[in-house]
Regions:
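Rossmann-fold cofactor-recognition segment
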Residues: 16-34
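Glycine-rich NAD(P)-binding loop of the Rossmann-fold in SDR/ketoreductase-type enzymes
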Residues: 27-30, 51, 68-76, 120, ...
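NAD(P)H-binding glycine-rich loop region in Rossmannoid oxidoreductase-like domains
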Residues: 29-72
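Catalytic helix-loop patch of NAD(P)-dependent Rossmann-fold dehydrogenases
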Residues: 71, 107-145
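Conserved Rossmann-fold NAD(P)-dependent oxidoreductase catalytic core, especially the SDR/UDP-sugar
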Residues: 79-123
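Flexible, glycine-rich beta-alpha linker
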Residues: 102, 125, 142-167
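Alpha-helical substrate-binding/gating segment
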Residues: 157-174, 179-206
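C-terminal substrate-binding subdomain of Rossmann-fold SDR/epimerase-dehydratase oxidoreductases
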Residues: 187-279
Length: 279
């Protein structure tokens, strides 16, 4: 919200949780009636919205039961997508997840770096919902050729306060193997949302959103060879280059990570903290 407002967008935050005041409206997104009413206009003086950023969800597996996670997240996304269509809103950006890529990679990925080109491999109820949301968006865009839905497959979201823990990950390469040692700084995640909103291309598309580097001080090539020795590495990797490919987001959305945990944590080994990150 702060990033969008800082870049000149007028934003209304519709959620069950928030601080009272201008720009926030409390809505239960599992209630379709509340959602569609809000999207037509929060009050008589407000005539609706140009676009929607849908981030409301139980944010990870194992926070609630599988059934509660499925019911909440699937219903919320259907309500938002359907209400947007009814309200004539033709641009939706929403949070999908890296989990559809096959996390925790107990079965190795088909290749490294992983990208958006291979079929989803959900391995939890949470990631199953994310996959079903993408499939729902594909069909809604087929029904309505003017609709634009962008799924951002966010990596593990981190804030600056989290970075002091990162050097400890080097003690065990397997500790963060579950998402190929990836992360996304919340500020760069906000940038990706903004770039997706400002991109015009009707239809459905999906993008991995991660930072340019890994959470590790060890080289990406060394990690891949040690933990996934039989998996094809499809390119020459930069020293700490992410194994969650962000090439598509860079190419199409103009997304470019501006932050790295290495600027906030004790000094680590390696001369190039974000190799693979264009200057």
């Amino acid at each position: 919200v702060a990033d969008l407002r800082a870049h000149g967008h007028e934003v209304t935050n519709i959620d069950q949780v928030g601080e009272r005041g201008s720009g926030y409206v409390r809505v239960d997104t599992t209630d379709y009636g509340q959602v569609v009413d809000a999207l037509f206009g929060v009050q008589d003086l407000h005539d609706g919205f140009d676009a929607i950023v849908h981030l409301a969800a139980i944010p990870a597996p194992a926070i609630l039961s599988d059934v509660a996670t499925f019911h909440n997240n699937m219903l919320t996304s259907f309500n938002v997508f359907q209400a947007a269509r009814r309200a004539g809103i033709r641009k939706i950006v929403y949070a999908s997840s890296e989990t559809v890529l096959g996390l925790p990679f107990d079965v190795p990925p088909p290749y490294i770096p992983v990208d958006e080109e291979y079929p989803a491999q959900p391995n939890s109820t949470y990631s199953l919902v994310k996959h079903l949301e993408e499939q729902m968006a594909i069909e809604l865009c087929r029904w309505d050729p003017e609709l634009q839905v962008t799924a951002l497959r966010f990596s593990n979201v981190m804030d600056v306060d989290d970075y002091e823990e990162f050097p400890g990950y080097d003690d065990d390469a397997l500790a963060r193997k579950w998402n190929l040692w990836g992360y996304i700084d919340g500020r760069d995640g906000a940038q990706a949302v903004r770039k997706a909103l400002e991109h015009d291309a009707p239809g459905f598309d999906r993008f991995i959103v991660a930072n340019a580097d890994t959470v590790m001080s060890r080289s990406s090539a060394e990690l891949a060879a040690e933990v996934f020795p039989g998996v094809e590495v499809t390119k020459e990797l930069g020293e700490h280059e992410t194994l969650l490919s962000i090439d598509k987001a860079r190419r199409i959305l103009g997304y470019e990570p501006e932050h790295t945990w290495r600027d906030h944590a004790p000094a680590t080994t390696g001369d190039d903290p974000v190799a693979g990150h264009p200057s």
